Each structure stands twice: as structure tokens, then as C-alpha cells.
Amino acid sequence: MLIRFKGAHIVDPGNINEQKDLLVKDGLVHALLDPGAADPEPGIDTVDVTGMLLVPGLIDLHVHLREPGHEYKETIQTGLMAAAKGGFTAVCPMPNTSPVNDNAQVTRFILDRAKAAGLSRVYPVGAITLGLKGETLAEYGEMKQAGMVAITDDGRPVENARVMRRAMEYATGLGLPVMSHSEDLSLARDGAMNEGSFATRIGIKGIPNAAESIMVMREIAIAELTHARVHIAHVSCEESVDAIRHGKQRGVQVTCETAPHYFTLTDKAVGDYDTHAKMNPPLRSEADRLAVIKGLQDGTIDCIATDHAPHSPLEKAVEFDQAAFGIIGLETSLVLSLKLVQDELLSMETLVEKMSRNPARFLGLDNRLIPGNPADITVIDPDRVHVIDPETFVSKSRNTPFAGIEVKGEVLLTMVEGRIIYQREI
């Protein structure tokens, strides 16, 4: 099958940033053609994407698909539907399922479900420790053979530094990166939002920046000691950005991600105890928000992920202290991130680096739009203005703090290996 994407501005960092036509054949990028060039062979289906942006498929390094065990929140099928609608051609599900993804059997189950869904690619992340208990290391070798790509105890920190050292040593021997949920529970325990004047005024126990940054510094130090690759998840505060910047300057193999809510909102979004603005780490101060943007600008922050964390209404419609941490993000991440481009804080090329190229590098993938590579593509309508409406989500859950916000830009089409897995109704 031959498909010609006609009229788009292609943004592929380090490769192309201009108007070209893209030809897809048998699931692969076949050729880049000048606008107006004749079809190189007969039987080509043309998709007119004039005025649109065409980029390598977006990749989300941090999602919670909830299956197995919590299918009332999300399933692999519905999570991948949300990913496709959000422009993501690949996602990395975290291991905090039930049972935990701490063995090859669960890894294979996730991959089998993903294959049956036939949507975005799935690269499972396995647990650092059995049962996420922070004690006994999981069997990384067997999980890697089954298809696991990295390890983390996300949702919980590995509190014991010796266990984390052993994990990094073991992972390094297998060529696996270690993703860190950086949280000092002795500082964060019982907290529900950012520690600051606003939390004091509304009477909510706070979580200080130090609860995150202390553990970020520890992980960087252990990675330096063990020569491991460490990836800091969901960076939210200025001190963490500074620590990662200094670690990179020392040559430590540290990468990191943030999420759109950390450069879009502050702790003021909690407002009148809005549990949809409760996540971990929490929304921080304006100074932290600006520090995260600076980290994206100067390359300290490598990736934008979602930390897509679905919850049922019953888990959010309770007192703020008792509500579950987490928000969904697969269907809103791109449109919120495009605001950075619209406000001239990032170039479109840099945004694609954060949401596609750098996540691909983390996974050891080459997702450039060059002949012979898989045709994993996201087409974006940069001008469509709309209001975020959770009732239109295809995710099972609706827990977002962005309901009612007007945004500019929307995914028009998502393609994986030459198959259109999502196309916006016009």
C-alpha cells in the first residue's frame, strides 16, 4: 500500500524542517518528495495535509495503563486508544499493576494485550524490586528477554540506597536504564500538595521541594558511582532541575522528564480543594514552573511525558487529603505543550525533540523520517482552537485539571508502521 502525505510542513529534528511530501510504502517511510513532484509510481493514495505539521510519532515514556488488576480505571485497550488520539505512537507503561510487572509472565501479558489492541506500540517498564517493596531485586534478565526496556518502582521510591546501588549495577550489566521516582517519604509522608503559603492558608499538609530534590541528588550520586544510566521521572521543582543540570555537567549519564502540568499550572490550581489538581509530585510554585521551562529550553530536561494516571470518580470525589494522587494526560499533553511554541518559549523543532526524538533515543530507537524507517507519524493541525472537554475523552477516566481550558492545536492523524490508528473526524 502506498500513501502520499501531501502539503505538510515536516518537522523532524536534525533531519528536515520544511514543506515536503512524505511517501509511505509497506509500513515504511519510502521517500520525501518536493511539493508538486509527480508520483514516482502508480496506485498512490493521497492524503491532503496542507497547512498541517507532520512529525515523527510522539513517544510517552511514562504512563499507567492499569492493566492487569485495575481495569476499572483503564485498560490497555482504552489507554492505547487515548494514546493514539493524543498523537502517541509508543508508550511505556509503569509496573505498578496488580500483579506488579516484576516478572517475565506479566511483561508478556502486557505485550500480548497490546498486540491484540493493534494500536500504539508498547514498551513495558519492569519493577526494580519484587512487589515494589524496595527490598529484593526483580529478575531483570528474564524480563528483558520478554520485552522489558527499563526498570522503576514508580509510584514509590527505592528508599534504601544500597538496594538502589545494587539495582543500578545489575541494570548496567544488562544495558538497562533505571527510572527513578524521586521522593523522600520521611519528608513527603502525609502531604497532599506543595508545601507553601497557599497550603498553609487552606489547611493542607504540604510536600516540600526537598522531598524530591534530595532523592534526585542521591540517584545522580549513585549513577556516578556505578556508571549507570539513570532517568529522573516527573521533575517538578527548581532544585531538581539544578541538580540534574550539574550532574550532566559532570558527565553523569542522567536524563529526565517533566510533564505538562508542571510547566502549565502551579499549586494555586488546587483552588477550592480541587482533587483533579492533586498529583505526586505536586504542582509547585511559579518559580518552580519557570525553572522547569528553563530546563526544557537549555536541554537539562530531555523529555516531556504525561505520567498518565487514570482514577475512577469515586477515588477523586472525596476529601482532598483522602483523594488519589494523579491525573490523566495522554489526550491533552500535546495541545498543552504546543502552548510553549505559541508563546515562543520553545521552537517546534525543540518540542518534537522533547516528545519524540529524545524519548526514542532513550529507548534506543531511530524514529527519523528517513527511507527505510518505520512509518510512525503524527499529523498535527496547529490552528484548530477548541476547549478541552473530558466527556470527549476515549480514556476510561476523566480526572484532569484542564477541563474547560481553551487550547490551540489538535492531532489530526496518528500512524504506526503505515497503519492509521487514529484520524480526527472532520
Swiss-Prot record:
Disulfide bonds: none annotated. Its EC number is 3.5.2.3. GO terms for cellular component: cytoplasm. It comes from the Bacteria. Zn(2+) 2 binds at residues 154, 181, 234. Pathway: Pyrimidine metabolism; UMP biosynthesis via de novo pathway; (S)-dihydroorotate from bicarbonate: step 3/3. Binds 2 Zn(2+) ions per subunit. It is an enzyme of class 3 (hydrolase). The keyword Zinc applies. PROSITE patterns: DIHYDROOROTASE_1 (PS00482), DIHYDROOROTASE_2 (PS00483). The active site is at residue 307. Its cofactor is Zn(2+). Keywords: Hydrolase, Metal-binding, Pyrimidine biosynthesis, Zinc. Zn(2+) 1 binds at residues 62, 64, 154, 307. SUPFAM superfamilies: Composite domain of metallo-dependent hydrolases, Metallo-dependent hydrolases. It catalyses: (S)-dihydroorotate + H2O = N-carbamoyl-L-aspartate + H(+). It holds the Pfam family Amidohydro_1. One of its GO terms (biological process) is 'de novo' UMP biosynthetic process. Substrate binds at residues 64-66, 96, 280, 311, 325-326. NCBIfam families: pyrC_multi. Belongs to the metallo-dependent hydrolases superfamily. DHOase family. Class I DHOase subfamily. Catalyzes the reversible cyclization of carbamoyl aspartate to dihydroorotate. This is Dihydroorotase. It comes from Desulforapulum autotrophicum (strain ATCC 43914 / DSM 3382 / VKM B-1955 / HRM2). The gene is pyrC.
